[in-house]
A protein has these predicted regions:
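Shared catalytic-loop signature of beta/alpha-barrel
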Residues: 45-47, 244, 250, 261-377
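Flexible C-terminal active-site loop/helix
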Residues: 1-15, 24-48, 333-405
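Short Gly/Pro-enriched turn/cap motifs at secondary-structure boundaries
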Residues: 54-58, 185, 361
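Glycine-rich, aromatic-flanked loop segments that form ligand/cofactor-binding clefts
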Residues: 124-127, 133-169
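Conserved, mostly hydrophobic/aromatic
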Residues: 3, 73, 94, 132, ...
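Metal- or metallocofactor-binding catalytic centers and their adjacent structured scaffolds
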Residues: 52-54, 69-143
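Hydrophobic faces of well-ordered beta-strands that scaffold small-molecule active sites
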Residues: 76-78, 162-164, 189-193, 224-230, ...
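Metal-dependent enolase-superfamily TIM-barrel catalytic cores that perform enediolate-based chemistry
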Residues: 159-267, 272
Length: 405
């Protein structure tokens, strides 16, 4: 089997009536690393895979999918690609490497792609390699007629505990209370709340954050785990100060309190903060993770198969985490892939899996087989492949992205 073409397919659809709340980029309030610059304080990050409201009351969704074709009429499909630069990198650097190659030679191809990006070993260049690697796994799984988890060695967990990521939810206390009760009633035993305040908002913002978590704890009761996502926007002093106030409501984890490159700060917080620290969502490859692990930087590490190097590298990362006797939880840009990868490890390595309640729904809009937790647990798909095939009935228009765009 040989690779015959590599292309990016742009899909557009109209969601007439979303089933629930949407992630609205114009309304979402969240903390951001750029908040320390006053002129950027209100310019939050745009999430490209989400619904865009239209004047007629409908919602437009535009996603980019990577398609790798073979001479065996088997396609590798993965998406949506969540950032603008990976398609350019795929077309410019990776497609010439891939054409004519055997998709079964995944480790060889990964090594060639990695060695070809010495000036882009992290960030969106590595995301491009990650999407390619996922598509190659899709080809091999389909050729074998097996779902991804079986190609990776089979289930260790038959189902995986899910936590609800509430990114995009309103921040007023009544909405927080209502959301907490709703998620607990849906069977979630763990909730992560993204926050809107950091050092730039001072003590007043800190007070509001503490009030939010008191409200959330009151809504869900004592038995639901509560986590906090600081989105790389705090500093060491702020984290230590607010953690002392949050421990009264039993917050069990603070995710990404500081910028990803501040590994020594992560290690200091992991050793001295009264609440455990998680991170790694914005780290890349086994070498990046080894540096974190050598510093004992986190209690829980969060690699993303769509970002950190693909399925191949993410597996190596989690194996490395397990060798250090630490915990992993996949950052779930691709929920189907995340569930396949989570279930092949015991709970002593991967105890829980993320589901982005709003972004996850939008990102799976075009999929034939979206993956969602039921009653608080994920179950991996049984269809051959990684589960990214497109439901053409949802596609209103489709074009192949030009190689020079």
């Amino acid at each position: 089997m040989k690779i015959t073409d590599v292309k990016i397919r742009t899909l557009t659809g109209i969601d007439q009536q979303p089933s629930g709340m949407i992630y609205d980029n114009k309304k979402v309030i969240r903390v951001a690393p750029t908040d320390i610059h006053p002129e950027y304080r209100k310019k939050k990050g745009h999430i490209s895979v989400t619904h865009v409201p239209q004047e007629d009351g409908t919602f437009k969704i535009t996603h980019h999918f990577l398609i790798i074709e073979t001479d065996a009429n088997i396609e590798g499909v993965v998406g949506p690609i969540s950032n603008p630069m990976p398609p350019l990198y795929i077309y410019t650097y990776l497609k010439p490497i891939l054409l004519g190659q055997d998709p079964w030679d995944s480790d060889r191809l990964w090594d060639i792609m990695y060695r070809s990006c010495v000036n882009g070993r992290k960030g969106e260049n590595m995301q491009a390699i990650s999407y390619v690697d996922c598509a190659l796994w899709d080809i091999r799984c389909k050729a074998a007629g097996l779902p991804l988890y079986k190609m990776l060695g089979g289930k260790v967990q038959t189902r995986i505990r899910a936590y609800a990521n509430t990114a995009g939810y309103p921040q007023d206390l009544e909405s927080v209370r209502s959301a907490g009760k709703d998620l607990a009633e849906k069977g979630f035993t763990a909730i992560k709340w993204g926050i809107a305040y950091g050092p730039a908002q001072g003590d007043a913002g800190m007070k509001k954050t503490v009030e939010i978590f008191r409200t959330l704890r009151d809504a869900v009761g004592p038995d639901v785990s509560i986590m906090l996502d600081a989105w790389s926007s705090w500093d060491v002093r702020y984290t230590l100060k607010i953690a002392e106030q949050l421990k009264e409501v039993d917050v069990c984890l603070i995710e990404e309190p500081v910028l990803a490159d501040l590994q020594d700060s992560y290690a200091y917080l992991n050793a001295h903060c009264c609440i455990p620290i998680s991170g790694g969502e914005h780290e890349y490859t086994r070498w990046g993770y080894k540096s974190l692990l050598d510093k004992d930087a986190c209690a829980l590490y969060q690699p993303d198969p769509a970002w950190s190097g693909g399925i191949s590298e993410c597996r190596r990362i989690i194996d490395l985490i397990s060798a250090y006797d630490r915990l992993a939880s996949i950052h779930n840009s691709l929920p189907g892939v995340g569930t396949h990868m989570s279930c092949i490890y015991p709970t002593s390595v991967v105890p829980i899996e993320e589901y982005l309640m709003l972004v996850g729904e939008a990102s799976q809009y075009f999929l034939k087989t979206p993956v969602r937790p039921e009653n608080g647990f994920f179950t991996p798909l049984e269809v051959p492949g990684i589960g990214m095939d497109i439901d053409e009935s949802k596609v209103d228009s489709s074009v192949i992205m030009p190689e020079q765009y």
